[in-house]
C-alpha cells in the first residue's frame, strides 16, 4: 500500500487528489437527500462523481426486516454489497457526499459498526472537490470482487428501549443533531408519518453549526464529539418516531 500518511476520520481534498491512484484506496459516493431537498442522489452520481467512486445506496443497504427506514444492515448484507462494489479487506476507504458533509458520516459510521477502521470522510465532500476544479467523470468504475471480514461492534448501537431508559433516568447525554426548528417541533418532519419534537431530556446540537461556510468540519469538531470528559456517553439521535414494532439499531 502506498498510503504514506495515515488518514483518520477526515481527509482533505488535497490528500485524496494525491492518493487517488493508490491501488488499495477505494472512494465511495454516499450521497443521500431528505425528501424536501428535491435532489436525486443516484442520478447526480451517474452524471458526475470523483473518478473511481462507487455509489453506496443508503436506501437499499439497510435492514430490510425492519419496518423502520435506514436501520443498519445485518453484517452479511453489508459484506455482500461491499464485495459487489469491489471493497474488501486491506482497502482504505474515503467517503464523500454531494451536500458537503451530511450522509457520508452515516456511511462512515456503518463501516465502523462493522469493525472497519480504515475509513475516512472527505472534508467538504463533492462540492469542495468540484469548486477546486478537480477531475470528475460520469463512467462507472471497474469492479472486482474482494473478500471482506467484518466484526459488528454492538456497543456502538443503542435500541429504543435503552434510549428511553437513559432518557428517563438521565443516565446519558442524548444529542439531537437536527436543526433547531425540527428539534422544537416548529416545522413538520420531512418524512411522512413522523411526530414533531424531540426525545425528552435530549440536547440540540445542530450538525450544521459544526461546519464552516464551505461545508468543511469546523475546528475541533471531531474532538467535540468523541471526548466527554465526565465518563458519560454521547449518543447521536434522529427523529422521534411512532412506537415501533421492532427495536434494533438506531435509525438515521
Task: For each feature predicted by the language model, list its residue ranges.
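Cytosolic catalytic domains that perform sulfur/thiol-centered chemistry
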Residues: 1-252
Amino acid at each position: 500500500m502506498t498510503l504514506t500518511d495515515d488518514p483518520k476520520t477526515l481527509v482533505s481534498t488535497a490528500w485524496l487528489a494525491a492518493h487517488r491512484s493508490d491501488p488499495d484506496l477505494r472512494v465511495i459516493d454516499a450521497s443521500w437527500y431528505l425528501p424536501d431537498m428535491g435532489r436525486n442522489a443516484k442520478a447526480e452520481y451517474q452524471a458526475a462523481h470523483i473518478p473511481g467512486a462507487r455509489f453506496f445506496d443508503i436506501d437499499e443497504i439497510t435492514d430490510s426486516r425492519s419496518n423502520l427506514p435506514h436501520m443498519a444492515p445485518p453484517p452479511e448484507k453489508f459484506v455482500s454489497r461491499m464485495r459487489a462494489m469491489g471493497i474488501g479487506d486491506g482497502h482504505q476507504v474515503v467517503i464523500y457526499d454531494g451536500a458537503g458533509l451530511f450522509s457520508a458520516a452515516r456511511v462512515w459510521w456503518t463501516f465502523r459498526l462493522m469493525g472497519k477502521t480504515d475509513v475516512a470522510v472527505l472534508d467538504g465532500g463533492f462540492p469542495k472537490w468540484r469548486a477546486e476544479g478537480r477531475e470528475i467523470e460520469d463512467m462507472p468504475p471497474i469492479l472486482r470482487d474482494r473478500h471482506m471480514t467484518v466484526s459488528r461492534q454492538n456497543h456502538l448501537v443503542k435500541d429504543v428501549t435503552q434510549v428511553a431508559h437513559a432518557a428517563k433516568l438521565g443516565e446519558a447525554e442524548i444529542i439531537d443533531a437536527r436543526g433547531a426548528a425540527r428539534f422544537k417541533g416548529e416545522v413538520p418532519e420531512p418524512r411522512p408519518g413522523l411526530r414533531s419534537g424531540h426525545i425528552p431530556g435530549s440536547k440540540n446540537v445542530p450538525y450544521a453549526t459544526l461546519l464552516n461556510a464551505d461545508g468543511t468540519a469546523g475546528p475541533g469538531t471531531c474532538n467535540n464529539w468523541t471526548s466527554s470528559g465526565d465518563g458519560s456517553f454521547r449518543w447521536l439521535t434522529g427523529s422521534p418516531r411512532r412506537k415501533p414494532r421492532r427495536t434494533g439499531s438506531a435509525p438515521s
